[in-house]
């Protein structure tokens, strides 16, 4: 006996995504704003259409992606809200990140110093987010007392605006 199977597909309801955004917001303090994580093409559901459908929502602070390429794709498709790169960034991307006002993740003084210099060359400031490793052992500075001094050094660099800090729970 032969089985004929139809191809599987996911139909994404952009109105439902918008409704879900507000359902989450209703559980939070009214002043809390959300960052929508749309990395890996929105986990295969279409980062660009999802981002375009919700970018004007008041409760949305911005978007997060995994790579510089994903961030640039959002910018090239009209996304104007802040974009945070959750993964590593590389020196060849620094000028583009600064010009496009994309927020990189920082967890070493060396990277922060390079970003500060690149921003100075463009006469700009660059907002960054500090990544703390709480057990995933991928990227981030250790969650220990020694990292406090490192964070202070990063925050004191010219052109660097320490906008936030995050972790990925293990």
Per-range role (PLM):
Residues 4, 8-11, 16, 30-170:
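Active-site-proximal beta-alpha core segment in soluble small-molecule metabolic enzymes
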Residues 21-32:
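Glycine-rich phosphate/diphosphate-binding loops that line cofactor/substrate pockets in enzymes
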């Amino acid at each position: 006996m032969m089985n004929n199977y139809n191809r599987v597909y996911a139909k994404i309801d952009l109105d439902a995504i918008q409704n879900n955004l507000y359902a989450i917001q209703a559980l939070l303090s009214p002043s809390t704003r959300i960052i929508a994580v749309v990395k890996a093409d929105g986990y295969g559901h279409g980062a660009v259409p999802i981002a375009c459908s919700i970018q004007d929502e008041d409760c949305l602070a911005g978007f997060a992606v995994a790579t510089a390429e994903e961030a640039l794709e959002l910018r090239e498709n009209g996304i104007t809200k802040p974009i945070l790169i959750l993964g590593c960034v590389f020196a060849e991307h620094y000028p583009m990140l600064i010009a496009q006002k994309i927020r990189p993740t920082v967890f070493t003084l060396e990277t922060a110093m390079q970003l500060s210099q690149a921003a100075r060359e463009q006469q700009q400031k660059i907002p960054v987010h500090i990544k703390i490793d709480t057990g995933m052992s991928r990227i981030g500075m250790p969650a220990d007392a020694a990292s406090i001094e490192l964070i202070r050094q990063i925050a004191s660099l010219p052109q660097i605006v320490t906008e936030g800090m995050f972790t990925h729970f293990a």
